[in-house]
Amino acid sequence: MKDQYDLVVVGAGPAGSIAATTAAKKGLSVLMLEKRQEIGEPVRCAEGVGKKRLRQHIELDEKWLCGEVSSAKIISPNGTTLTMAEEDAGSEVGYVLDRKIFDRTLVELSGEAGVDIMVKARVTGLIIEENTVCGVEMMHLGKTYSIRSKLVIGADGVESKVGRWAGIDTSLKPSHIETCAQFLVSGVDIDQSSCYFYMGNKVAPGGYVWVFPKGNNMANVGIGILGSRAGEKKPIEYLTDFVEANYPNGSIIEQVAGAVPASGPIEKTIANGLMLVGDAARQSDPFTGGGISNAMDAGLYAGEVAAEAIAQDDVSEKILQKYEKRWRGSFGNEIANNLIVKETFFSLSDEDLDSLALSIKDVDFKKMDLIDFIAALFKANKKLLWNLRPLFTQKLKQKFSGLTKFKR
C-alpha cells in the first residue's frame, strides 16, 4: 500500500465509489477505504431508485436488478389509495436493486478504473496542516497508518465523522433522524409492478411503512420513524405488527436496522482539502429518506471537481465551491422543498391525512401544477394549506428565479 495519493475516499457506498471511479478515470491516484469487511453489508434501504438517474451512472445488469416498478401506491390511514406513475412518484421509484450486489459492482468498476481499495480499514482521524485536510489516519488489521493526499472525500454515511473532524457541523437533532427497520419477507402476495407507502400515526408515527417488491413473492418491508416521535414502542415493533396484520402468511428471512438523515442539507459540505457526499453531507431526501440517486450524482460532481482542483494545484474551499454549487443546483431545491413537506405531513393527524387523500385521489398528477395542488389542498383542509405556505413561497421563488436567469 502506498502512503500518498492524489485523493482518499472514505466510504465505499454509491457516493464514494462513483466519486472514486470518476476521479480515477480523470487520471488521479485514488485510495478508497471501507470500514466494514464486506462491501454492501448491511443493507439499510428499501433498494428503490429512479430509472433515468441510475442509467446516467451505470449500465443495467440483471445480476443486481430485482425488479421494475411502474407505479407507487400511497395508502392513507383509512385505506384510501393514491396511485402515482413512476415519473411522478419520486427518485426511489423505478427499479428495485439488490444493494449487496449493486454496491459491489460499483466498487468493482472503481477497481477497474485503477482505484486502490481496502476493506476493514477504519479511518480514525484526519491529517490537517495549515487549516487544510491533507490525508487520513487509519487502522487496518490492527496496524495504524498515515496516508497523505491532496484531497479527501468523506462518504462515510449517516454516522459520518470526517466532516466533524474538519470542523463542519454535521450534527443531527432527533427530529432530523429517521430510525429505520426493514424485513425481507417471503410469501408476500402483492402487485410486483408497484411499490407501496403506508401513512398514519398508528402504523408509523412521524414516518411511513414502505413495501418494495423483489420478485418471487418477496418484498422489502420497512419502516422509518422520526427520532423525535419515537416513544416506548420501537420501530421494529411497529413493523412486526404491520407484517403480522398485512402479510399473515409471510416469513421474515432477513432483518436490519439503521438510521437515515432527514434534516435537509447541512450549511456547507466543503472545507479546505475536503468534500462530503451522500448521507455524510445529509443529501438524502428528508421526506422519503431515499438517497441512492442523490448520492451517485454527488459522487460524480465531487470526483469531477477533485480532478479540476488538483489539476489547478488548489484544493482550497474557494475552489471546492464548484462542487457545492453543482450539487445544490442539481437537486438541492428538491431537498429543501421536501424538508418542508416532511415537517408538515409528519405532523398531521390521521384525520388530516385521510381528508387530503380523499380530496386528491382522483387527480391526474401528470396534469397537476402548483395551482391545482393548492386548490386540492384548500378543498381538503385549509389548515394544511396554511401549514404548507413556506413550500409554495419557496417554489414560487425558485420558479421566478429560473425565469430571471433565462431572461439574462
UniProtKB/Swiss-Prot annotation:
Pfam family, one: FAD_oxidored
EC number(s) from the headed UniProt entry: 1.3.7.11
Catalyzed chemical reaction(s): a 2,3-bis-O-phytanyl-sn-glycerol 1-phospholipid + 8 oxidized 2[4Fe-4S]-[ferredoxin] = a 2,3-bis-O-(geranylgeranyl)-sn-glycerol 1-phospholipid + 8 reduced 2[4Fe-4S]-[ferredoxin] + 16 H(+); 2,3-bis-O-(phytanyl)-sn-glycerol 1-phosphate + 8 oxidized 2[4Fe-4S]-[ferredoxin] = 2,3-bis-O-(geranylgeranyl)-sn-glycerol 1-phosphate + 8 reduced 2[4Fe-4S]-[ferredoxin] + 16 H(+); a 2,3-bis-O-phytanyl-sn-glycerol 1-phospholipid + 8 A = a 2,3-bis-O-(geranylgeranyl)-sn-glycerol 1-phospholipid + 8 AH2; CDP-2,3-bis-O-(geranylgeranyl)-sn-glycerol + 8 AH2 = CDP-2,3-bis-O-(phytanyl)-sn-glycerol + 8 A
Cofactor dependency: FAD
Cofactor: record remark: Binds 1 FAD per subunit.
Positions annotated to bind FAD: 15, 34, 45-46, 48, 99, 123, 279, 291-292
Gene3D superfamilies: D-Amino Acid Oxidase, subunit A, domain 2, FAD/NAD(P)-binding domain
Gene Ontology cellular-component terms listed: membrane
Main EC class the enzyme belongs to: oxidoreductase
GO BP of this protein: glycerophospholipid biosynthetic process; membrane lipid biosynthetic process
GO MF entry, a single one: oxidoreductase activity, acting on the CH-CH group of donors, NAD or NADP as acceptor
Keyword Nucleus belongs to the record: no
Keywords annotated in UniProt: FAD, Flavoprotein, Lipid biosynthesis, Lipid metabolism, Oxidoreductase, Phospholipid biosynthesis, Phospholipid metabolism
Remarks, miscellaneous: Reduction reaction proceeds via syn addition of hydrogen for double bonds.
Protein function: Is involved in the reduction of 2,3-digeranylgeranylglycerophospholipids (unsaturated archaeols) into 2,3-diphytanylglycerophospholipids (saturated archaeols) in the biosynthesis of archaeal membrane lipids. Catalyzes the formation of archaetidic acid (2,3-di-O-phytanyl-sn-glyceryl phosphate) from 2,3-di-O-geranylgeranylglyceryl phosphate (DGGGP) via the hydrogenation of each double bond of the isoprenoid chains.
Family: Belongs to the geranylgeranyl reductase family. DGGGPL reductase subfamily.
NCBIfam families: GG-red-SF
Name this protein carries in UniProt: Digeranylgeranylglycerophospholipid reductase 1
